[in-house]
């Protein structure tokens, strides 16, 4: 994203990981980030125990429970995070990064945010909330750490090896938003077909 020299991989579209659909995945030098988009604007209340709210309206997490009710946003995030961890561990050998995946829930716009204290520190501090306008600023603050407070470090090589192992060739690159100059020669050939300004096709992980 703008002003950053690090390599950042962003996969968009409908991603299916171990049977679970997620909206996006970001891999950067200090975190793997699960991205979920919510089409709500205004006052947002996000909490670890209980429902999330848009004003007085409950925000559904997505999947249904056995009793027919839908999971909370946080419950769904935990499910998706576990699925992502298990799915990525076959391709990314950095165990600390896979075991400490972060989440970023992005709303259309937020006029006020009441964020549970549990999301600010402690075991659930992996949950982050932003809106579309401030997504880059929030992403910059997301830095994964282990339980022993060790920083997560993913090298450019880790990211490029993931691209290779998943076979993400030119067809998947949106060149309008990508700096293809940083890519190794075996991963991008300008003369081959690529997406250009279009959205990339779905990726099955």
For the regions a language model picked out, list residue spans one by one.
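Surface-exposed interaction regions that form or flank ligand-binding interfaces
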Residues: 1-21, 26-33, 38-48, 53-205
């Amino acid at each position: 994203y703008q002003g950053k020299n690090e390599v950042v991989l962003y996969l968009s579209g409908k991603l299916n990981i171990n049977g679970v659909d997620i909206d996006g995945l970001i891999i950067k030098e200090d975190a793997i980030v699960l991205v979920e988009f919510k089409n709500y604007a205004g006052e947002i209340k996000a909490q670890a125990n209980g429902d999330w709210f848009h004003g007085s309206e409950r925000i559904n997490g997505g999947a249904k429970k056995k009793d027919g009710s839908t999971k909370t946003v946080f419950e769904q995030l935990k499910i998706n995070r576990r699925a992502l961890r298990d799915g990525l561990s076959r391709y990314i050998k950095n165990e600390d990064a896979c075991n400490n995946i972060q989440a970023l829930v992005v709303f259309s716009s937020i006029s006020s945010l009441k964020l549970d204290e549990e999301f600010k520190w402690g075991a659930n501090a992996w949950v982050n909330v932003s809106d579309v306008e401030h997504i880059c600023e929030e992403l910059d603050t997301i830095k994964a750490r282990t339980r022993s407070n060790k920083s997560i470090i993913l090298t450019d090589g880790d990211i490029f090896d993931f691209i290779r192992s998943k076979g993400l060739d030119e067809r998947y690159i949106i060149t309008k938003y990508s700096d293809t100059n940083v890519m190794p020669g075996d991963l991008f050939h300008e003369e081959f077909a690529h997406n250009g300004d279009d959205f990339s096709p779905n990726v099955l992980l």
